């Protein structure tokens, strides 16, 4: 298998790195769901993009905000 993208993510993120698909997510409480990442904004949460808001935002198996 060799080097994974998670290694690159670890190098890029200082605290708690987390690899989701091809995107790197940084920050405390970083969590990746099976539907990849969630995009947290002031008006909601969208799956399929890296998280840009609160770290507490998570996506369930149906790719919807919970």
UniProtKB/Swiss-Prot annotation:
Q: Which residues carry this modification: N-acetylserine?
A: 1
Q: What does this protein do?
A: The metallothioneins are involved in the cellular sequestration of toxic metal ions and regulation of essential trace elements.
Which species is the source of this protein? Answer: Arianta arbustorum (Land snail)
Q: What induces it?
A: By cadmium.
Q: What is known of its domains?
A: 14 cysteine residues are arranged in C-X-C groups. These are thought to be the metal-binding sites in other metallothioneins.
Which residues, if any, are the signal sequence? none
What residues bind Cd(2+) 2, as annotated?
13, 18, 32, 35
GO MF entry, a single one: metal ion binding
Positions contributing to Cd(2+) 1 binding: 9, 13, 26, 30
InterPro entries in the record, alphabetically? Metalthion_mollusc
Residues involved in Cd(2+) 4 binding:
38, 51, 57, 65
Q: Identify the keywords attached in UniProt to this record, alphabetized.
A: Acetylation, Cadmium, Metal-binding, Metal-thiolate cluster
The molecule here is called: Metallothionein
Chain sites annotated for binding Cd(2+) 5:
40, 45, 47, 51
Q: Does the keyword Aminoacyl-tRNA synthetase apply?
A: no
Residues bound to Cd(2+) 6 are 47, 59, 63, 65
Q: Which residues bind Cd(2+) 3?
A: 20, 24, 26, 35
Q: Which family does it belong to?
A: Belongs to the metallothionein superfamily. Type 2 family.
């Amino acid at each position: 298998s060799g080097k994974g993208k998670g290694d690159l993510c670890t190098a890029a993120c200082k605290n708690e790195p987390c690899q989701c698909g091809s995107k790197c997510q940084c920050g405390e409480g970083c969590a990746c769901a099976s539907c990849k990442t969630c995009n947290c904004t002031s008006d909601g949460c969208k799956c399929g993009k890296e998280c840009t808001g609160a770290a507490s935002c998570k996506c369930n198996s149906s790719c919807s905000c919970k």
